[in-house]
Amino acid sequence: MARKKLKKRKLLISLFFLVSIPLALFVLATTLSKPIEISKETEEIDEQQVFIDSLSGHAQILYEKYHVLPSITIAQAILESDWGNSELAAKANNLFGVKGNYKGHHVTMETDEVEKGKRKTIRAKFRKYSTFFESMDDHAQLFVRGTSWNKKKYKPVLEAGNYKEAATALQTSGYATDPDYADKISAIVEKYDLDEYDEVNPSLKSVDLNASIKDSAVQDVWSKPSTDDRSIRLTSAQSYVGKDIKVVSKKQKGQSVWYQFQINDKLIGWIDDSAVEIKEAT
């Protein structure tokens, strides 16, 4: 009788292991096969930093030329274009909501305006640009040239000693109708530490070069030179082999030279110059 009970117990134990081990292995395999989920917030923060990195170098180049604070340029681009995702940015490369025509080109779209404390929607013509950089160039020149009726309209923006003064000057000069515009710009600068770009960077140069990625390139493409803090790897250079690229910015740091490039007027990222074959200047 005791032997029968012992056999029965052994049988139950064997059945337990036969069932539980495969089940455990199945659960483990299922868990390992699932991709690691990245929260939407984390992904969004990365995309935002990539957007900032794509504009910061050119904003510093423009600062040296026109004295518009880079923090203001970037913050306005963020606010006005929703991080480059607005319909106006997509259709017209217009980052700042600048109205009118640009070299005969424009798009007509709806926009919200505040008049006598009331918000209303109107249809207006907005300038259409070839690239984001062209939009930034025109934006800086707008502050320099003023308007047809007041050449010094935006002079206080250019003379501002810091981003808070510049944001206030934007508000008082009538750049935007939103009564909270200055506060919104300052808040963006502070949240993303954009004032760290408010200096002339002599290592940065604007260029215009036709080029291609070398077939043998093993380098990566970055949101800004990988030697810089908080640079984000975007993709491998091999993704762009065989495609014509346009080099639009150059940065030298020690013995390293980096190029910012675009394809079909769209900014891509930064890459070490050893991966690039320059064809000719345009």
Swiss-Prot record:
Its EC number is 3.2.1.-. GO terms for cellular component: extracellular region. It comes from the Bacteria. InterPro entries: Glycosyl_Hydrolase_73, GW_dom, GW_dom_sf, MGlyc_endo_b_GlcNAc-like_dom. It is found in: Secreted, Cell wall. Induction: Expressed under control of sigma-A RNA polymerase. Residues 203-281 form the GW domain. GO terms for biological process: cell wall organization. One of its GO terms (molecular function) is amidase activity. SMART domains: LYZ2. Residues 1-29 form the signal peptide. Its cofactor is Mg(2+). SUPFAM superfamilies: Prokaryotic SH3-related domain. Keywords: Cell wall, Cell wall biogenesis/degradation, Glycosidase, Hydrolase, Magnesium, Secreted, Signal. Optimal pH is about 5.7. The keyword Secreted applies. Inhibited by EDTA. Belongs to the glycosyl hydrolase 73 family. Is the major glucosaminidase responsible for peptidoglycan structural determination during vegetative growth. Catalyzes the hydrolysis of 1,4-beta-linkages between N-acetyl-D-glucosamine and N-acetylmuramic acid residues in peptidoglycan. Acts processively from the ends of the glycan strands. Also plays a role in motility, chemotaxis and cell division. This is Exo-glucosaminidase LytG. The gene is lytG.
